[in-house]
């Protein structure tokens, strides 16, 4: 037999392969026994806090993730993905992203900008001539920063353009999605002010589709999901069976009841994607480590934009933006230095989500819940207060 060859019999220094295997097994077993003692103490605090928030807020299901030093360090699910069937939330549970989808649209737009395929200063009609002129020049930059004057939900009349479609689910086509609102009057002149709008990002996704010469959803798949290994990120098409999709819940008359399923296909670029917690964490980690755009592009994307009269908007290009001055974030342990955070939140039927990144520290937290009555700011703030790095001594 090969393991009794002369190389072992005649060499006293040779190590028997069986002994090597047993030594490896012993070392691995020892490592597994010691592992619980090596778990960072903050993870237990996170677990306790999240369970407490679930109880206080009567949340049904929750998943959270923590990225520290540019690495995913914590991922966990809590509660029920389907309360009625007693299906627990796991890392495989699928939650709607809601408006965090806007950051996907922002990244795909900036990737095209890097390739000179999308000009941020160009009129959106240069890419999407189907959109009416409205006696205004709406630039790509305006759409990326919520300054295009496109109607949102309740801040102006939404005028649909009726038409017959050859398909049962026409809004898989982002150009056709424009028929939901393209006849609506602008709510303000482009660049005049910041006015948050999901429909503005639908128009932006149409420009991305035209500039990239590929379906918008496929650009997200090929240039974001695949490079980051996000295996579950996809459009949340209600007519498709998506394994592990969470049931949504809301409060009605003080009771937590099942939410209504709604079609979000028409607003894919503004709030139509779904994934598990692992993939949202991978997106945050990829952003922090410049895996999707160049560092200079990321800096541009995460620079707070201004209106025509130089008023700061609190929003970058596809990402919300907040600067906390010295001592302002005492409850989150910001301490003595200013802190700049970027990210996005999401709110719609069946979900509340949040992704907050601290670029200077390569740190992020991600939160997803199927309870649309959740106070996501409170929950995320509590999570941040635990994982926030200690302030250096004077």
Q: What label would you give each PLM region?
A:
Residues 234-243:
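Short, surface-exposed recognition loops and adjoining beta-strand edges that mediate ligand/DNA contacts
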Residues 2-3:
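Tryptophan (W) side chains
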Residues 10, 16-89, 95, 111-119, ...:
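N-terminal leader/targeting segments and the immediately adjacent pre-domain N-terminus
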Residues 64-66, 70-71, 96-119, 123, ...:
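Alpha-helical scaffold elements that line and support the substrate/ligand-binding pocket
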Residues 38-76, 155, 209-214, 218-222, ...:
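Catalytic loop of the DD-peptidase/beta-lactamase superfamily, centered on the K-T-G motif
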Residues 129-137, 224-234, 305-312:
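Short, mixed-charge aromatic SLiMs
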Residues 80-198, 212-214, 240, 247-257, ...:
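Active-site-proximal loop and beta-strand segments within enzyme catalytic domains
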């Amino acid at each position: 037999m090969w393991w009794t060859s002369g190389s072992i019999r005649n060499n006293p220094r040779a190590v028997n392969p069986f002994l090597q295997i047993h030594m490896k097994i012993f070392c691995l077993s020892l490592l597994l026994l010691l592992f619980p003692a090596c778990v960072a103490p903050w993870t237990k605090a996170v677990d306790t806090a999240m369970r407490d928030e679930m109880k206080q807020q009567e949340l049904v299901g929750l998943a959270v993730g923590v990225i520290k030093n540019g690495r995913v360090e914590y991922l966990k699910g809590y509660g029920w993905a389907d309360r009625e069937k007693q299906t627990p939330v796991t890392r495989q549970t699928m939650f709607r992203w809601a408006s965090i989808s806007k950051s996907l649209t922002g990244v795909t737009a900036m990737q095209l900008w890097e390739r000179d395929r999308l000009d941020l200063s160009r009129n959106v009609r240069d890419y999407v001539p189907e959109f009416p002129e409205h006696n205004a020049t709406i630039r790509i930059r305006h759409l990326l920063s919520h300054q295009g004057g496109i109607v949102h939900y309740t801040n102006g009349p939404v005028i649909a353009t009726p038409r017959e479609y050859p398909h049962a689910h026409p809004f898989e086509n982002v150009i056709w999605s424009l028929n939901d609102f393209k006849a609506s009057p602008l709510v303000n002149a482009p660049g005049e002010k910041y006015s948050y709008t999901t429909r503005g990002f639908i128009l932006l996704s149409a420009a991305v589709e035209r500039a990239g010469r590929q379906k918008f959803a496929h650009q997200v798949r090929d240039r974001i999901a695949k490079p980051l290994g996000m295996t579950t990120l996809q459009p949340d098409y209600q007519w498709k069976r998506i394994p592990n999709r969470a049931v949504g819940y809301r409060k009605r008359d003080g009771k937590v009841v099942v939410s209504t399923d709604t079609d979000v296909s028409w607003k894919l670029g503004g709030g139509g994607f779904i994934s598990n917690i692992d993939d949202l964490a991978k997106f945050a980690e990829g952003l922090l480590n410049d895996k999707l755009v160049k560092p200079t592009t990321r800096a541009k994307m995460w620079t707070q934009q201004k209106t025509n009269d130089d008023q700061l908007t609190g929003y970058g290009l596809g990402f919300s933006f907040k600067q906390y001055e010295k001592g302002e974030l005492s409850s989150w342990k910001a301490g003595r230095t200013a802190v700049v955070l970027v990210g996005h939140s999401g709110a719609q039927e069946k979900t509340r989500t949040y992704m907050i990144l601290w670029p200077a520290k390569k740190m992020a937290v991600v939160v997803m819940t199927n309870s649309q009555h959740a106070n996501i700011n409170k929950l995320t703030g509590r999570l941040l207060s635990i994982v926030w790095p200690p302030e250096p001594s004077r």
